[in-house]
Design a protein with these regions (language model features):
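N-terminal hydrophobic/helix-forming segments and targeting peptides
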Residues: 1-309
Length: 309
């Protein structure tokens, strides 16, 4: 991002880029991902772990992972063959106490390259599906990061100030955005994340649809005028969109902490619909990513034009 402005990385590994002058927009998406942390190495050489972020234990067994020790160590989360399972085992969801990673090493070999506290991530399994849909781990929220990057060339042309924040530790309690937005004092903020994409396993009323455009958040904690103006902008520029209504006092995204940072920030939320969230096989439609970028640019242009009118 150094082609666009001054780039800094803080002590929490938040990446920030600032450029331009005028009405000040903060655009946020988080860089971090769910994963695990090494707790111990058994006498048999298996790696015991605990979770970092909201991991669904149902999808862990037989997953391919990388342990980030002194070097990248490939591993498999061990599972019990069906032939050896007892009655009821097939319906049981394992706890993290029962989870272990097989790296094919003895304890002595593992201890030379793996330390307690090393991080564990899921294997990057990028797959092109039909049309413009893709599958991979970490699309939550690298797809949001990608949408902001796609918007940068056009944003650079607009007479406004921008702080681009690619935040850390969203999956651990929104910690990165809370720290990194302190002292920025933007006029408005837009957080870009993912939200639930429909599959036959969930209710349509709870989800957006893949390929039908970005989801504009409506919530008591989000700025209602911003949300409505983003919707009107999408209609004006013929950008497909969906409405996501979130009750209660939270959205589960960085928008929650941006709204109450310092004196408060007017904040909107745009989400990319995603299937199989928090799994190694998350799915998004690249058309939704591109339309999210287009919507950000269009809204900023409209807002700056309104201010300068």
């Amino acid at each position: 991002m150094s082609d666009y402005g001054d780039v800094t990385v803080d002590s929490l590994n938040n990446v920030k880029c600032e450029f331009g002058q005028g009405f000040h927009f903060l655009l946020d998406a988080h860089l971090d991902e769910i994963g695990m942390i090494v707790k111990s190495i058994t006498d048999d050489g298996f790696i015991k772990v605990d979770k970092c972020g909201g991991i669904d234990c149902r999808m862990l067994l037989a997953s391919e992972v990388s342990v980030w020790g002194k070097e990248e160590i490939k591993g498999i989360i061990s599972n019990l063959p069906p032939h050896l399972q007892k009655k009821g085992d097939s319906k049981k969801v394992p706890s993290f106490d029962e989870i272990s990673i097989d790296v094919g090493m003895t304890k002595e070999e593992a201890q030379k390259v793996i330390s307690l506290g090393d991080r564990v991530t899921f294997k990057r399994n990028f797959t092109q599906l039909a049309g413009t849909q893709i599958s991979s781990s970490v699309l939550d929220d690298r797809s949001g990061v990608a949408s902001i990057i796609l918007a940068l060339d056009e944003l650079k042309k607009i007479n406004a100030k921008f702080t681009i924040l690619f935040s850390s530790q969203e999956e651990l309690g929104l910690r990165g955005a809370k720290a990194a937005s302190f002292g920025v004092n933007p006029d408005e903020a837009i957080s870009v994340d993912v939200s639930f994409g429909y599959t036959p396993m969930c209710k349509k009323s709870d989800c957006g649809e893949i390929g039908k455009g970005p989801m504009i958040g409506i919530s008591p904690i989000l700025d209602s005028k911003m949300s409505n103006d983003i919707k009107l902008t999408a209609e004006k520029y013929n950008i497909p969109y969906q409405i996501e209504v979130m009750g209660g006092g939270h959205t589960g995204t960085n928008a929650d902490v941006l709204t109450v940072n310092e004196k408060g920030i007017k904040t909107a939320l745009i989400s990319i619909p995603e299937k199989y969230m928090h799994s190694p096989v998350e799915v998004v439609d690249t058309a939704d990513v591109e339309n999210t970028a287009s919507l950000i640019v269009a809204y900023v242009k409209e807002r700056v034009g309104e201010i300068n009118a």
